[in-house]
Amino acid sequence: MSRMAEQQLYIHGGYTSATSGRTFETINPANGNVLATVQAAGREDVDRAVKSAQQGQKIWAAMTAMERSRILRRAVDILRERNDELAKLETLDTGKAYSETSTVDIVTGADVLEYYAGLIPALEGSQIPLRETLFVYTRREPLGVVAGIGAWNYPIQIALWKSAPALAAGNAMIFKPSEVTPLTALKLAEIYSEAGLPDGVFNVLPGVGAETGQYLTEHPGIAKVSFTGGVASGKKVMANSAASSLKEVTMELGGKSPLIVFDDADLDLAADIAMMANFFSSGQVCTNGTRVFVPAKCKAAFEQKILARVERIRAGDVFDPQTNFGPLVSFPHRDNVLRYIVKGKEEGARVLCGGDVLKGDGLDNGAWVAPTVFTDCSDEMTIVREEIFGPVMSILTYESEEEVIRRANDTDYGLAAGIVTADLNRAHRVIHQLEAGICWINTWGESPAEMPVGGYKHSGIGRENGVMTLQSYTQVKSIQVEMAKFQSIF
């Protein structure tokens, strides 16, 4: 693909030049080619976007629930019509295989938007009788202008996960995509406008997180920030949001999730789940089950099943339908993952497979890392303690249910957890003791629109998807009505 035209900001229904004068480049990680130069939003651009959003939000909130629902449903239709076009752009920008982006990223994002479009008429208040002449009623009102700050691993899906409930509740959103993968969020803005969204209701500001993101979190005109990213950045976002204007926040901050295989499990099923929990999207999924606990007596058999499945991984041309494994999203990220792999070797973990870059067959110029499985791991190892966000699985052994529950919970993170077992009683008994916000039994990874997702501990605050997320983009107003004569004590 030839280099794209310089990408601008999207404010008030159209493209506009950034006032900052700064730009950055977005790279195709499969081959290192520059996809586009992108303009970076500065402080004045954030001010412009907020003013635009304030104007648009008043128009949007004044529409009926059915009017808003119809517009969002039109956006869903356009997303599905352009699924392949958007998936190709997502593959170029992220490096993910087209077989994945064309069946997951836009599809699931559109599902979430359709879900919230259908929920809009269900945003209701309540009536509370107090006595014969006195009652209270409540209204759910939009927050106003909110900000979404996205991560680089699921660019358009995250933009939809954040904008869908916000817009459904009558808010306007200013979205800052990751500077690593900014392209499809701009296309989403075009689609919203084409569907009939009033100008200003969805503005997109590409830029560097430490600048553009900080300006958004500090701006007094923004009522809430929804952030997806790392813990350190999340703490800064939360601190800035509180210090500026006590903004509400939703935080999704990653994890180091346990996958527990019990001795009664079907090891073929367990191996299939472990593969998806570690190598889907080349390991760049926040919920990945990178700490795989297996009974000591099952370790050797489990390892053989994993090795057999690693052989089925197909890296190569990301647009080949048979390719199911792409490069990492960027060269700096690849280098960071490789540093973790070196650390694992130094600390005594045994490499079962992988452990280096992938080369040959057109891969030499890309950010490729081989699917890597470490075994003979221990809880104190760096690769077991820290989030790597790459194709790196750690296999650990255990002896008892009590032991594995304790060790699974021995982490600052609490985003996800899963177990594989044939015993239904054990499944629920153990899941109820795991300190994680998203749990799977005999499966892994699916996050449907109806399912609230989010973390415990350092993995986040608040939830995305589900009914409760729609409500989190509203504020409740209570109105007391007295029908009798008011009695004053004076």
Curated annotation (Swiss-Prot):
Listed cofactors: K(+)
Annotated metabolic or biological route of this protein: Amine and polyamine biosynthesis; betaine biosynthesis via choline pathway; betaine from betaine aldehyde: step 1/1
InterPro entries, per database record: Ald_DH/histidinol_DH, Ald_DH_C, Ald_DH_CS_CYS, Ald_DH_CS_GLU, Ald_DH_N, Aldehyde_DH_dom, BADH
Keyword entries, A-Z: Metal-binding, NAD, NADP, Oxidation, Oxidoreductase, Potassium
Molecular functions (GO terms): betaine-aldehyde dehydrogenase (NAD+) activity; metal ion binding
Residues bound to K(+) 1: T26, I27, D93, V180
Enzyme nomenclature, EC number: 1.2.1.8
Record note on cofactor: Binds 2 potassium ions per subunit.
Family matches, as PROSITE patterns: ALDEHYDE_DEHYDR_CYS, ALDEHYDE_DEHYDR_GLU
Modified residues (Cysteine sulfenic acid (-SOH)): C286
Binding locations of K(+) 2: L246, K457, G460
Disulphide-bridged cysteine pairs: none
Enzymatic reactions: betaine aldehyde + NAD(+) + H2O = glycine betaine + NADH + 2 H(+)
Binding of NAD(+), residues: G150, A151, W152, K176, P177, S178, E179, G230, V231, A232, S233, G254, C286, E387
Entry-linked CDD domains: ALDH_F9_TMBADH
NCBIfam families xref list: BADH, PRK13252.1
Subunit structure: Dimer of dimers.
Role, per record: Involved in the biosynthesis of the osmoprotectant glycine betaine. Catalyzes the irreversible oxidation of betaine aldehyde to the corresponding acid.
Family as reported in the entry's similarity comment: Belongs to the aldehyde dehydrogenase family.
PANTHER family, per the entry: ALDEHYDE DEHYDROGENASE-RELATED
Name of this chain's protein: Betaine aldehyde dehydrogenase
